[in-house]
Amino acid sequence: MSQKLVLILNCGSSSLKFSILDPKTGEEKLSGLAEAFYLDDARIKWKLHGEKGNAELGKGAAHSEALNFIVNNIFPLDPTLKDGIVAIGHRIVHGGEKFTSSVIVTDEVVKGIEDAIQFAPLHNPAHLIGIKEAFKIFPHLKDKNVVVFDTAFHQTMPEEAYLYALPYSLYKEHGVRRYGAHGTSHYFVSREAAKRLGVAEDKVNVITCHLGNGGSVSAVRHGQCIDTSMGLTPLEGLVMGTRCGDIDPAIMFYMHDTLGMSVEEINTTLTKKSGLLGLTEVTSDCRFAEDNYDNEDESLRVPAKRAMDVYCYRLAKYIGSYMAVIGERLDAIVFTGGIGENSAHVREITLNHLKLFGYQLDQEKNLAARFGNEGIITADNTPIAMVIPTNEELVIAQDTARLCIKD
C-alpha cells in the first residue's frame, strides 16, 4: 500500500509555500516556494527528494497558477506523490477567539476565517484563496482539508494576560484583545522540549523563543500557553526584522500630529521600516548585526551593535518577566526559528542578561547548536537553555492526519 501523504499549503498575499510530508515518519517528500505573485517575474522553486528545480510561472501568475504548476509539472516527476496525497493542511495566521484547535474545513469554518480578516488583513484573505484553489484542483479531497491556526495554542491564556487596559467594550463588542502568533511553533518546541527533558507534556514549564524575521516569546506552564508577546496583531512584542515591537502608543500621535505623517505612512514605518532595519538603517537581516558586532570599521560596528544590543535586551526582558509569570519550576528556555536556531551571538548576549537567574552559557555547546543541530547550550548543573529546530509543517501534517486519515 502506498504512503498516506499530506499536502501542506501556506498561502501569503504574494507567495505560496508548499510541502508534502509523511505524517507518520515526518519525511519530507517535496518542498517549495512560489513567489512574486501578480508581478512580471512570478516564479517557483522546489526540492523533490533532494533535487532542486525552478521555473517561471508567467506574468501576473498567482496562487491558482502556482498550484496548477505543482500538479501538472512537479507531480509527474514522481507519480507516487499525487497518488499518495490523502489530505491537505492549511496554515492560517489568525483564527480569532473562535478556534482553539485545528479543524476540518466547512462553510462555518470559512466564515470564521473571514470574520478574523480584520485582525490579519493581508494573510487571511490569502489563506482563503488557498482553500478555494485546493477545493478546485483536488475536488476529491474537499472533505479532507484541515486548517491549523497560529493563534490556537494561545487560546489558553487567562484573561489577565490577553486583555488590554482599554474600555472593556472594545473587547466585548469588537474582539480587541491579545491573540498571539507562531502558536504552531511554540506548541511544537514545547512538546519536543518535554520529550528531551523527560517531563510529561502536561507538566512541562518552558519559555519558548521563536526568533525569525518575526519573533515572539511564549510562557508555557503545565504544557499550556499562559502568555505570549504578540498581541492583537504580530506588531506587538519583541524587536523584529522590520517591525518595531512594543512602543509608547503616543509615538503614533506624535508622528501624525507633529511630523505630519499619514496613518498609512505610520503603519508602513512601524511594520516595514522599523526593528533591525530601523536600528541599523541598513538591513532587516540579523546576520548583519551579528557579523559586524565587533567590526573594526566603526560605520559597520556602531549600527550593528546598536541593533543587536536592543534586540537582545528586549528579548531578555520578556524572558525574565515570563519567569515571574510561570511562577514555579522552569524546565528550560528554548530557542527556535531562523535566528533562534542559528545565531549563537543572540543567544549569548540574551543569556548574559539572565545571569542573576544562574544561566551560564557553554560556548562550545552554543556554537555547536547551529545550522540544524540542537541541544542544551548551558553549562552542566546550571539552569537549562536549549536549541530545538521548529517544524511547523510536521504539526500541520500530524493534525491533518489525525482528523482525516483513518488507519
UniProtKB/Swiss-Prot annotation:
Which domain of life does this protein belong to? Bacteria
Catalytic activity as recorded in UniProt? acetate + ATP = acetyl phosphate + ADP
Any Pfam family hit: Acetate_kinase
Q: Which CDD domains does UniProt cross-reference here? A: ASKHA_NBD_AcK_PK (cd24010)
Q: Which GO terms describe its cellular component?
A: cytosol
Tell me which Gene Ontology terms the entry assigns under biological process: acetate metabolic process; acetyl-CoA biosynthetic process
Where is it located?
A: Cytoplasm
Which amino acids does the record list as binding substrate? R91
Q: Which residues bind Mg(2+)?
A: N10, E392
Keywords for this entry? Answer: ATP-binding, Cytoplasm, Kinase, Magnesium, Metal-binding, Nucleotide-binding, Transferase
InterPro entries, alphabetically?
Answer: Ac/propionate_kinase, Aliphatic_acid_kin_short-chain, Aliphatic_acid_kinase_CS, ATPase_NBD
Q: How is the cofactor bound?
A: Mg(2+). Can also accept Mn(2+).
User: Site feature Transition state stabilizer: at which residues?
Assistant: H182, R243
Q: Identify the metabolic or biological route this protein is part of.
A: Metabolic intermediate biosynthesis; acetyl-CoA biosynthesis; acetyl-CoA from acetate: step 1/2
* One Gene Ontology term of the molecular function aspect: ATP binding
The EC class name is transferase
- Tell me, how does this one assemble? Homodimer.
Q: Which family does it belong to?
A: Belongs to the acetokinase family.
The free-text function statement in the UniProt record for this protein reads: Catalyzes the formation of acetyl phosphate from acetate and ATP. Can also catalyze the reverse reaction.
Q: What is the designated name of this protein?
A: Acetate kinase
- Point out the gene that encodes the protein: ackA
